[in-house]
Amino acid sequence: FLSLIPHAINAVSALANHG
C-alpha cells in the first residue's frame, strides 16, 4: 500500500503539471 502512495502522487503531479 505504501508503495502505491508515491505512484499515485506522481500521477496526480504529472496531471497537474500538464494542466
Swiss-Prot record:
Keywords assigned by UniProt, alphabetized:
Amidation, Amphibian defense peptide, Antimicrobial, Secreted
Instruction: Return the GO cellular component terms, semicolon-separated.
Output: extracellular region
**Tissue expr:** Expressed by the skin glands.
Q: Where in the cell is it found?
A: Secreted
Q: Principal localization?
A: secreted
Q: Which residues carry this modification: Glycine amide?
A: 19
Q: Which GO terms describe its biological process?
A: defense response
Free-text function comment from the UniProt entry = Has antimicrobial activity.
Instruction: Give the family from UniProt.
Output: Belongs to the frog skin active peptide (FSAP) family. Phylloseptin subfamily.
State what protein this is by name.
Phyllospetin-H3
Q: What gene name is given for the protein in this entry?
A: psn3
